[in-house]
Amino acid sequence: MRTMHCFLFILLFCLGQVFTDVIFTSERCNRVTYGLRTVNGDPSRYKQCGPSGRVWIVPCAPQMTFDPEDRVCKERLDSRIVKPMRKYETSRTIITTPAPIPSSYPVSAEVIAPGAPAASHAAPEEFVFSTIRPKSRKPKAKTRGKFRKTTTAMIQTTTPMTVESFESMEMTTTPKIVIFASKKNMNNTNRSGESRTQLIRNRNRERGNAPAFTRPGRVRTTTPMSVTHATRFVPGIQHKVTVAPKEVQGMPHTLAPYEKMDRRPDSFGVEELTTMTPEYTVRYNGQTMTENEFLNQLLHIVQHQKTVSERQQQEKFEKMEQERLRQEKEEKARELERRRKLEESETARQAELDRQATIYAEQERMAMERNRELERIRLEEKKRENERVRQEEIAMEISKIRELERLQLERQRKNERVRQELEAARKYKLQEEERQRKIQQQKVEMEQIRQQEEARQEQLRVLEEERARELERVRQEELERQHQMEILRQQEEDQKKKKLEKDREQREQQEAEELNRMIIEKEMKENKQKMIEEKNKRKMLEKEMEDRQNAIYEEEERRIAEEERRKQIEIEERRRIQQQIMIATEERSRLDAMEREREMLRQIKESEKQRKELERQELLATTPITTIKPIYRPDISEYRPPDVESHMIRFTTQSPEWATPSPTWNPAWNTVTAEEETPGIPIIHSQCQVNGECELKYDVDSFCAHPRSPSMYLQCAPLYGRLGRWTERYCPDTLIFIVSIGRCEKGEETRKPYDPDNRVVIPRLPSETSFVEWKGNRVIDHQLPTHISPPRVYPPVPETHQPQIYSTIDQFPKDLLPKIPELATAEKTYAQQYQNHIHGSVVSGGHNHQVVRPIAPTPTIAPNSNVPVSYQISQSQNSLSTNSIKSEIDLSHIHPLFPRVQPDFLSRMLPSLNFKMHDENSGAQSLGSVVKPVLKKIALNQTEQFLDRLLADQKNDEKLRKETIDRLKSSNSDNITKKN
């Protein structure tokens, strides 16, 4: 009985309106990787993975099919090729009678109500069996009420129906499908169930059609109920459902998945008896029948509905084809009329064009004559201009030759001066040799004096020994005297006068000896002081000789270096002149080539215009008129895509922003004691796609070279989980991304020398909201008017004035200045004399002994000097500027504002700096007080060539100063020796 109810539910769903046609399968799937897939044999459906991890078969919207390439449902292009969508109609009335089916029943004929509209005839019909689990059973009264609402009333009859009654039913307004039940099914009871199943298979094989659905072949697992009675029956006469030839000519079937199944024909004779094993019988609509008999009737209903639907569909397609042919005929007639009108208008337009062509030809001839005259005038002007340029070049060459001759003459004069200096040096060398000979004689005399001093020292030693012996003798006598006084104490009174006299004589003798000793010590000190003075004098003479020799060597080296530099300057000047000539020649050739290209482009445009005009005329004359069928596209208001697609999952977030702290966040720099976190070594990839997927690393960054721009790079930004996306990042200005080190750096080929006028933009800390711009060693103040500085000139030949480097060093911090050695007192005196002799500067008071640095005059600039912009003097180089920064700075050139990739010189420099970054007593400090010393340190470390070039003058001045000091020292030493 339970099985009977299940099939009753299936029948009601087939005949009633289908609430849902989504098929839920038991196939497992992965929602992440499954996506949308096609259904074999049914283009109007597609598969997707449901929320429970099972495959769903979902239909597209009406009149749409699933595109396997784009993975989306699209409108059907041609209804004749793609099968129409299913149309769900209300179920028809089912009549069951026990009468046999007559042989004259027109199965293939249409069952259409005469009064039904034409639109309902062409609508196809289909039954969709869903695999949704049926709901639990409810009370019988409610179930009947529900069925009564969803299905039409079942007309029951107990009398056999004849052919006449069936024909009368065909003429009614409501078409009804009649199912006949044979009375012979009660006669045969000896035939087994297996033989009956074999007969059913033979009948299906003869018919050549498979059943609409698979028969239930499950094995009973419950205990069968007791058999009430055995039945003998003959199945009803099932005629083969015939289909007209028109209906099988490639038309789409309703149930595509069932077309490829093996259909077994049914072969039931009219008089054949079927013997079955005892089965359970049910009473349905007043009839007692078995389960298999009920299923056979249901199968017949489905086959009949399918045949009727195919016939209606075929007629609908025929009407559509006739309508299409009629529209094509009308369209062709309209097209012929339109072509006739176009030909008439084209004839009139061609006549007008011929009339205009004559006028245009005359105007073109006059324009060509005018252009030829203008071209002749232009050629004459160009010839005069070329002659003028040639004369200027000749004059320039003559001036350059004269300049070279002047330089040659000056060089000869300098060589003569050098020769004279060498001659003077040779004479000075001879004098020096004579002086050396005199010094040797003085050394011999000093050796003799030293020997005499040694002899005198020996005599002093002997005298000292004699004095010591005398003192010992006096001490012995004193002891003896005391002993006598101890013995002769009683006789003291008698010998008092004698003792007093003797004591007086002894005191006088001791005073005389002490006086002699003091005289000897004084003479020894005087001799020692004389020896020390002579030794110091000898050392001073040796030092002066060594300094003089070094000065001669340095002078020779300076002359050699000066000659090499002069040669190099001449070579550079000659190369510069050749380059200017070459550049002028290339510029003239480039202008001529541009003029030729411009003329060629004008001719090409004219020929292209004429060719297009000819092609357009030929196209209008020869192109046949084609008919373009309009494509139906719904209006925007009618068709809007769904907000959320059912086949994809979207993770929507806000636009990515760089997290920056609040403006009030200002941590104390001196309280941070934790060590900085050392980031891991970044991973560098290659051949990455922009916005492509990447594997996100939590501990290190992943970078990749940009496929197009070297000033950009790709960073793996987090998407969700371990999945990331390659996001474009911009390096700061003047930097490029170097793949080998994974940082934004200056390339070796593009690295430029230090330029004090170059502006560098450095981002502030996250707590600050602007940028700091540096120019040289100063912060640029945008609030003050900036002055345009004249060009900075650094002459290659050392000049006599003080070098320009002092004005730059005065602005540097004291601890970063180069170590300049201090002069001794005598050397300061010589340096002051030299400075007064050369510059005429005023020396400060003698109490401080400081050298006054002369102010360097501003060098004059030649009117035609080719001085690069990077070597230009700044008038405001000594002006003070503050840290105030304009807030209207364009931040679009730095993406992101605080990149993870920092320049290499900052990463090397900042950790190694050892200075106090914050002072408790100074209050809040700006970024300039922290970064400015860093940039000064960087400037000194990065600009060795620049400083060498600026310090060249100072080095030469130092050499000249040493030479002058040596000469003054030598003259003073000569005067001292002469006096001695």
Swiss-Prot record:
Sugar-bearing residue positions: 187, 190, 941, 975
Entry keyword set: Glycoprotein, Signal
Signal sequence, renumbered to the chain: 1-20
Region of interest: Disordered: 310-354, 431-451, 486-512
Pfam families: DUF5401
Family annotation (PANTHER family): DYNACTIN 1-RELATED MICROTUBULE-BINDING (PTHR18916), RESTIN HOMOLOG (PTHR18916:SF93)
Protein's name in the database: Chitin binding domain containing chtb-2
The keyword Glycoprotein is assigned to this record: yes
